[in-house]
């Protein structure tokens, strides 16, 4: 009689120093041979205590923390925070500022999806899309720099409007970029979409059902790839989105390939939105008239003592926000990015809670990847579009 051998799963560490980990992610895998039986994600390696740090800053000083959350699509986070503070202040912003916000938020969406698609392709072994797409990303970062002075951490969208009006020739350059970008997207389509190796690595990999997506709190392209047309720009419109025409791309199977297709389609919809905004962009101010919230112009400060006092008070003490609490969410490139602020009537938030879409997507990695081969894990992680700045906070 032979002794029965009990086979236990092998434990394997994936990351945190791994090129496909997209930052500082550590996964503890239980493997049955080459098949994944269980995944335990370990987070917190990039934790900085952002929510607590915000409690010690004025409402304006807290803004740059949001750029550093999802650092590949910074303006979307600033936007959510600014809308949340404006809701508490009951502050109306000029129409030109709304248009500029939407223009830069849609450029941010393109910026994010270009990085995600190129890195997903690189994880699987295709290097060409990365080289092509980073050239286009560089152009968008150039627009960021010309508008705000910074390529990444721009702090451009602020409570009360935007930091400053854009240079006169920037709008023309964005228009030129947008008009030729569809041709570039066609080239990427030709390169990837029907490529048989790309399809073999992505079709029917990491399938998520509609019920699972809703149960785990998915949003953004992850939810829409399952066939649920949920987009905050349509369902709970903010800024000027109700006046713009665009469609919500949805998938059918909820697999890695559908998530890729949804992001590709979203880039095309962003181009459509940008064309409408650039055509209709009105003239006028870009900040609210309330000098307790937005600083006065330099020319005013040279002539008016009150303007100088307003400027000094704004950047030293800040403004007090009425007592109350509110939640505001925007359709960020990765999903629903929400900010919940509790104000106690002082110049600093009493509590600020951040809802990061990537957190909900990463927590479901066990159910998504279970039963797949180890080689498929890189494709699944690439399709989740996770950044640890916002997950660890």
UniProtKB/Swiss-Prot annotation:
Reaction(s) catalysed by this chain's protein: a quinone + NADH + 5 H(+)(in) = a quinol + NAD(+) + 4 H(+)(out)
GO cellular component: plasma membrane
Pfam families (UniProt xref): Complex1_49kDa (PF00346)
Enzyme Commission number(s): 7.1.1.-
Family, per entry: Belongs to the complex I 49 kDa subunit family.
HAMAP family documented for this protein: NDH1_NuoD
Disulfide bonds: none
Name by which UniProt lists this protein: NADH-quinone oxidoreductase subunit D
Enzymatic class: translocase
Protein localization: Cell inner membrane
Organism, as annotated: Ehrlichia canis (strain Jake)
Keywords assigned by UniProt, alphabetized: Cell inner membrane, Cell membrane, Membrane, NAD, Quinone, Translocase, Transport, Ubiquinone
Subunit description: NDH-1 is composed of 14 different subunits. Subunits NuoB, C, D, E, F, and G constitute the peripheral sector of the complex.
GO molecular function: NAD binding; NADH:ubiquinone reductase (non-electrogenic) activity; quinone binding
Organismal lineage: Bacteria, Pseudomonadati, Pseudomonadota, Alphaproteobacteria, Rickettsiales
Topology in membrane: Peripheral membrane protein
Gene3D superfamilies: Cytochrome-c3 Hydrogenase, chain B (1.10.645.10)
Function: NDH-1 shuttles electrons from NADH, via FMN and iron-sulfur (Fe-S) centers, to quinones in the respiratory chain. The immediate electron acceptor for the enzyme in this species is believed to be ubiquinone. Couples the redox reaction to proton translocation (for every two electrons transferred, four hydrogen ions are translocated across the cytoplasmic membrane), and thus conserves the redox energy in a proton gradient.
């Amino acid at each position: 009689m032979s002794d029965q051998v009990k086979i236990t799963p092998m434990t394997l560490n994936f990351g945190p120093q791994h090129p496909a980990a997209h930052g500082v992610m550590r996964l503890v895998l239980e493997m049955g041979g080459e098949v994944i039986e269980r995944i335990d994600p370990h987070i917190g390696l990039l934790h900085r205590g952002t929510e607590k740090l915000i409690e010690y800053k004025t409402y304006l000083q807290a803004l740059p923390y949001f750029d550093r959350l999802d650092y590949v699509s910074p303006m979307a986070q600033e936007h959510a925070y600014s809308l949340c503070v404006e809701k508490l202040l009951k502050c109306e912003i000029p129409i030109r500022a709304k248009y500029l916000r939407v223009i830069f938020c849609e450029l941010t969406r393109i910026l994010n999806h270009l990085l995600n698609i190129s890195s997903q392709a690189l994880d699987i072994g295709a290097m060409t899309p990365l080289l092509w797409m980073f050239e286009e990303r560089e152009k968008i970062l150039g627009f960021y720099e010309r508008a705000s002075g910074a390529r990444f951490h721009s702090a451009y969208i602020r409570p009360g409007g935007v930091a400053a009006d854009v240079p006169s020739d920037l709008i023309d350059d964005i228009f030129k970029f947008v008009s030729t970008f569809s041709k570039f997207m066609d080239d990427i389509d030709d390169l990837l979409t029907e490529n048989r190796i790309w399809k073999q690595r992505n079709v029917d990999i990491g399938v998520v059902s509609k019920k699972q997506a809703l149960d785990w709190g998915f949003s953004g392209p992850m939810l829409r790839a399952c066939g649920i047309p949920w987009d905050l720009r349509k369902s709970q419109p903010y800024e000027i989105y109700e006046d713009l025409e665009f469609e919500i791309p949805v998938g059918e199977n909820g697999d890695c390939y559908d998530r890729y297709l949804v992001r590709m389609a979203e880039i095309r919809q962003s181009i459509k939105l940008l064309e409408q905004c650039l055509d209709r962009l009105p003239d006028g101010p870009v900040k609210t008239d309330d000098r307790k919230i937005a600083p006065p112009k330099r020319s005013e400060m040279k002539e008016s003592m009150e303007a100088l006092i307003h400027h000094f008070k704004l950047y030293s003490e800040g403004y007090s926000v009425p007592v109350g609490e509110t939640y505001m969410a925007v359709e960020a490139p990765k999903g629903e990015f929400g900010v919940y602020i509790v104000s106690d009537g002082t110049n600093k938030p009493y509590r600020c809670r951040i809802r990061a879409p990537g957190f909900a997507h990463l927590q479901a990695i066990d159910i998504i990847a279970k039963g797949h081969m180890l080689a498929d894990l890189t494709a699944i992680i690439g399709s989740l579009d996770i950044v640890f700045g916002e997950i660890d906070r």
